[in-house]
């Protein structure tokens, strides 16, 4: 705990809840976070199962909270045995300074060390998802940040504080109002079908090999989400070799915000390089629109070749985020 005559860095406590909520509501939108009613901010942040005052710190000036930082830990979080997760930092404009950032980061990082963590991380593995507004859109939003937005002073401050940017993720977006699968993609689908691979919506009574395909992809998050979608009967576009599942995109799930959600696109190794990823993504967008989604947004690595697929479907980059790690 840091303390000077009128300045104190300390753990937050339940008695600080109203002050923390007020700080968030007044200042988080400046970072691009979506505006939410108090009760919704509580659900997303201060009452979230992973929220803990043990990993929340306040800068107080003459007894008044002027900034706070929040993180979380959990051995069930991917890499959680060695990593603590940075969640957010909000500050009054007069106190939104490099000094405040360093003081709060120091406090959070020390708490991670005490908990036995060796790394402080800002990644999409953080289970506390805070929605943000998509620039230039009519109020559309994405449901979480995978890092620190590169347009924020916080990004440079964290790099200066010893964080390493391991990669950058770009947020891509398009509305679905005028979306339609173009003729050239339809033609590609016909050529691919002639070569033995077709597209369909997953039907457990007709299609097999979903589990084997997921096992080959070796992505635990995809396995959990796609298996649950198939079990629950959600719309799941798949690529087929005969009746064997060769790949997936989805599942199709319009969120209450109007966003078409999906876990990802995966093609089994033996069926790659046949344009199936592109065909599935175009089909996914059509199914999301049919199900009532009005827009889609997603993240991809700035150097990920899949970015070309998204761009060919009319998606544009709207914001870039740095994935940050620091060895403690």
Located regions from the model:
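Acyl-donor-binding surface of acyltransferase catalytic domains
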Residues: 2-3, 97-193, 322-326
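A short, internal acetyl-CoA/4′-phosphopantetheine-binding micro-motif in the GNAT/acyltransferase core
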Residues: 86-99, 124-129, 265-273
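Conserved active-site tyrosine of GNAT-family acetyltransferases
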Residues: 158, 310-311, 315
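A structural microfeature
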Residues: 67, 167-170, 247, 319
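Conserved acetyl-CoA-binding loop-helix of GNAT-fold acetyltransferases
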Residues: 96-113, 267, 273-286, 290, ...
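Short amphipathic alpha-helix that is part of the acyltransferase structural core
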Residues: 2-45, 56-58, 169, 184-221
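Conserved hydrophobic beta-strand within the GNAT/NAT acetyltransferase core sheet
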Residues: 120-123, 262, 296-300
């Amino acid at each position: 705990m840091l303390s000077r005559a009128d300045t104190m860095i300390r753990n937050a406590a339940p008695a600080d809840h109203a002050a923390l909520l007020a700080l968030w509501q007044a200042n988080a939108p400046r970072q691009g976070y979506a505006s939410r009613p108090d009760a919704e901010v509580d659900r997303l942040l201060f009452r979230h199962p992973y929220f803990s005052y043990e990993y929340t710190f306040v800068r107080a000036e003459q007894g008044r909270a002027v900034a706070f930082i929040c993180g979380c830990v959990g051995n069930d979080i991917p890499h959680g045995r060695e990593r603590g997760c940075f969640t957010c930092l909000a500050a009054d404009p007069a106190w939104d300074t490099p000094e405040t950032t360093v003081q709060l980061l120091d406090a959070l990082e020390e708490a991670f060390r005490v908990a036995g963590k060796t790394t402080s991380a800002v990644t999409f593995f953080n289970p506390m998802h805070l929605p943000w507004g998509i620039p230039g859109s009519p109020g559309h939003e994405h449901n979480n940040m995978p890092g620190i937005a590169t347009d924020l002073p916080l990004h440079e401050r964290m790099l200066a504080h010893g964080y390493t940017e391991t990669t950058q993720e770009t947020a891509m977006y398009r509305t679905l109002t005028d979306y339609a699968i173009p003729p050239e993609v339809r033609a590609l689908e016909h050529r691919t079908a002639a070569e033995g691979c077709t597209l369909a919506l997953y039907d457990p009574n007709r299609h097999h090999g979903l589990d084997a395909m997921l096992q080959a992809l070796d992505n635990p998050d995809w396995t959990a989400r796609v298996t649950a979608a198939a079990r629950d009967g959600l719309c799941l576009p798949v690529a087929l070799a005969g009746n064997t599942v060769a790949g997936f995109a989805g599942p199709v799930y319009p969120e209450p915000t109007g966003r078409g959600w999906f876990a990802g696109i995966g093609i089994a190794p033996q069926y790659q390089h046949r344009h199936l990823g592109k065909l599935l993504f175009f089909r996914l967008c059509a199914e999301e629109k049919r199900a009532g989604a009005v827009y889609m947004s997603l993240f991809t690595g700035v150097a990920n070749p899949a970015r070309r697929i998204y761009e060919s479907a009319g998606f544009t980059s709207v914001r870039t985020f740095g994935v940050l790690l620091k060895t403690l």
